[in-house]
Curated annotation (Swiss-Prot):
Function: Allows the formation of correctly charged Gln-tRNA(Gln) through the transamidation of misacylated Glu-tRNA(Gln) in organisms which lack glutaminyl-tRNA synthetase. The reaction takes place in the presence of glutamine and ATP through an activated gamma-phospho-Glu-tRNA(Gln). The GatDE system is specific for glutamate and does not act on aspartate.
Any one GO MF annotation of this record: asparaginase activity
Name listed for the protein in its UniProt record: Glutamyl-tRNA(Gln) amidotransferase subunit D
EC number: 6.3.5.-
Catalytic reactions of this protein: L-glutamyl-tRNA(Gln) + L-glutamine + ATP + H2O = L-glutaminyl-tRNA(Gln) + L-glutamate + ADP + phosphate + H(+)
Residues in Asparaginase/glutaminase domain copies: 74-405
Pfam family, one: GatD_N
Source organism of the structure: Methanococcus maripaludis (strain DSM 14266 / JCM 13030 / NBRC 101832 / S2 / LL)
Biological process according to GO: amino acid metabolic process; regulation of translational fidelity; translation
């Protein structure tokens, strides 16, 4: 028995005939009788079901908008990987569904029609905590396809939990002349405080700018006045629930974007695009997944490092204390990693500031054991960078490149106002 079938349902003392309708409860059969009334029947009370006539399952949906492209606007592709910003709510069931056809987007955020010609595509539908390195590769491949097919800017709708990891991965993997903007939402579209619509408007606007590179766009403060555009390798989620959870670290944001006036105010120098190469995309998606990120803490045991080495890991990022330190009791594990050609690099768990392993004897001894200081790199960025380097270079060259700036991840000096 399927939706659309005309059926006869026999109960203990009566029968009902009608067309099977969608039901919000899997234990209830709903039919529309010839009288026009709907009736719901508990499946347990049905003694027999007779299909009198098979029907076609009805197709639900709004008619297409049939919008024509505006030749004065740029063509922007919005790729959905899932998350709060990439969904709409079914108020009958409470279910959340992906909403990323172009028509879905325009119906949800009609202001987009004045910003760009929109194309929507779902490439993943996952919660961002379930993001995997192979999905970064899928996303990079989708970006390349869209650009080669005429997209002049890319917006990636992403869950916020791991969005900074993906931004970092794409920064190392994708070399193109178009802006690639990752956008999320902290509050779902059914909540009055939702940031989804304004973030998408601002992200699409940013994607029309004559810049290149990978960026994250989110609310710039708790109100609705401005959104901030952050460099993909210098941004981190710093609050679990606030709408302005994402902040640039050791750097100022690239720009402020007003989602109402569509004004973009640049706050520092930006990478300008070369329009003559707008369809050229170079991908390098090789990743070594056997890389770990370990937070250093008082009493940490060398056996932890030995575990990773013995299980075939090729690289370790240590999130050290202060300027980049570990307890001396951890040195044995570092020696073991070095003896087995496992690349070990150091970031700081203070988040702000930079590693300086020349100040104290602990840091100097760690360097003598082969630990690479990661300057002012964020731990998550260093983790992704090491995956990228070990996936593309031999050990010696990867070690040399770890402390060199490749995709904006290292600042020579830090603005004290950041």
């Amino acid at each position: 028995m399927d939706i659309g079938d005309f059926v006869k349902l026999e109960l203990e003392n009566t029968t009902y005939s009608g067309t099977v309708m969608p039901s919000l409860n899997e234990d209830t059969v709903v039919i529309k009788m010839k009288s026009g009334y709907n009736v719901g029947i508990d499946k347990k009370k049905i003694k027999n079901i007779e299909i009198l006539e098979s029907g076609d399952k009805p197709k639900y949906g709004l008619p297409p908008l049939n919008l024509e492209k505006n030749p004065k606007l740029k063509n922007i592709s919005i790729l959905s990987t899932g998350g709060t910003v990439a969904s709409r709510v079914d108020y009958k069931t409470g279910a959340v569904h992906p909403a990323f056809t172009a028509d879905d987007l325009i119906r949800a955020v009609p202001e987009l029609m004045d910003v760009a010609n929109i194309k929507g595509k779902v490439i993943l539908n996952i919660l961002s905590e379930n993001m995997l390195p192979k999905y970064w590769v899928m996303t990079a491949d989708a970006i390349k396809e869209e650009i080669e097919n005429g997209a002049e800017g890319i917006v990636i709708a992403h869950g916020t939990d791991t969005m900074h990891y993906t931004a970092s991965a794409l920064s190392f993997m994708v070399n193109s002349e178009v802006p690639i903007i990752l956008v999320g939402a902290q509050r779902s579209s059914d909540r009055p405080s939702s940031d989804a619509a304004l973030n998408i408007i601002a992200a699409v606007k940013a994607a029309t700018e004559p810049i290149k590179g990978v960026y994250v766009l989110m609310h710039g403060e708790t109100g609705d006045t401005v959104c901030h555009l952050h460099e993909g390798t210098k941004v981190r989620k710093l609050h679990s629930s606030r709408r302005d959870a994402f902040k640039s670290v050791n750097e100022t944001p690239i720009a402020e974007v007003n989602p109402f006036t569509k004004k973009v105010t640049y706050l520092r120098e930006v990478k300008s695009q070369d329009r003559s190469k707008i369809k050229e995309v170079v991908l390098n998606t090789n990743l070594e997944e056997k890389v770990a990120l370990i937070k250093v803490y008082p009493g940490i045991d060398s056996e932890i490092l030995k575990f990773y080495v013995d299980n075939g890991y090729k690289g370790i990022i240590l999130e050290g204390t202060g300027l980049g330190h570990t307890p001396e009791t951890f040195f044995e594990g570092i020696d073991y990693a070095n003896e087995n050609n496992v690349l070990v690099a150091m970031t700081t768990q203070t988040i702000n500031g930079r590693v300086n392993m020349n100040v104290y004897s602990n840091g100097r001894e760690l360097q003598a054991k082969g630990v690479i200081p990661c300057e002012d790199m964020l731990s998550e960025v260093a983790f992704v960078k090491l995956m990228h380097l070990l996936g593309n270079y031999e050990f010696k060259e990867a070690k040399e490149l770890m402390s060199k700036n490749i995709a904006g991840e290292i600042n020579e000096s830090i603005n004290l106002e950041c």
